[in-house]
Amino acid sequence: MPRIFFSCPLMAFAVFLMSINLGQARSFNNDFETGDLTDWKMDDTENNAFEFQPTWGDNPTARNRGQPSKHQGDWWIGTYEKYQGPIKGKKLKQKPGGTQGDGPQGQITSIKFTIVGATMNFLIGGGNHPWKDEPMPCCGNLKIDGKVVLTATGNATETMTREEWDVAKYKGKTAQIEVLDKHSGGWGHPNFDDIHQADARGKNIPWDRILTVDARGKLAATWAQMKKYY
C-alpha cells in the first residue's frame, strides 16, 4: 500500500483553513435576534434597565402609544419596555404593552470587533440625552481604546430611524458599542437595534466575515479576507 506523506507547510495550511472556517461560523448578535444579550455585557447597576432586554415586537403599538418602534426582526433594545415575547414573557407573567418606565438605569457593552468598513449604521430612537451635553445620557456610543469617539441619540420618539457614523478613519482599530441608559427623567430611555458596518458603496458587510473578536478573544478571520471591502 503506497504511503502518503504530508509536508509541514501543507499541514500548516490545512490548519489555517480550518481556523478560518471555524472563525467564519462566529457572528455577532448585532440585532438581538438571539432573544437575549449574547455578545453584550450588562453592567452591575442595581435594578438594571437592561434586565428585561431585549424586548419583543412592537410593544409601543401594543400599548397604543401612536409611535411604532420600526424595529428589525422580532427583538430590539427598548429600556422603557418590559415584554419579552409570547414564550419568555408569558413565563415571567409579562403582557404585551408592558413597561418598566424611565426609572431604571444601566448600560450594555458589546464584544470587541475590528473596524473594517467605511461607515456603521444602526436603528436608534428613544430619548434625546446626548453623551457630552448631559450628565445623564441615553445614547449609543462607539468606543475605541476605551474612549467614546462617536455617539448618537434618539429624537424623543419611540420610533427608531437609521443613523450612520463615518468610521473610515478608524479602520483597523478594535472597537466596542455601548448603549447607555443613565437618565431617569422624561424620555430617559434609549431604543436601539440592528447595527452594521458597511463598505464604501454602502453595502453592509456580513458580521461573520469581519475581524470580530469572539468571546474567547480570538480573531475570527484574517485581514486578507477583508481586502475586498477596501
Residue ranges and their predicted role:
Residues 9-19:
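Bacterial N-terminal signal peptides
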Residues 23-27:
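Boundary at the C-terminal end of the N-terminal hydrophobic targeting segment
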Residues 32, 119-126, 175-181:
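Extracellular beta-strand-rich recognition modules
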Residues 36-88:
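Extracellular glycan-recognition surfaces and repeat-rich motifs
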Residues 77, 82-119, 161-164:
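Short beta-strands within extracellular/lumenal beta-sheet-rich domains
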Residues 104, 183-207, 220:
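Extracellular carbohydrate recognition
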Residues 116, 123-137, 184-187:
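Extended, low-complexity, turn-rich repeat/linker tracts enriched in Gly/Pro/Ser/Thr and Asp/Glu
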Residues 139-175, 180-190:
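Extracellular carbohydrate recognition and processing domains
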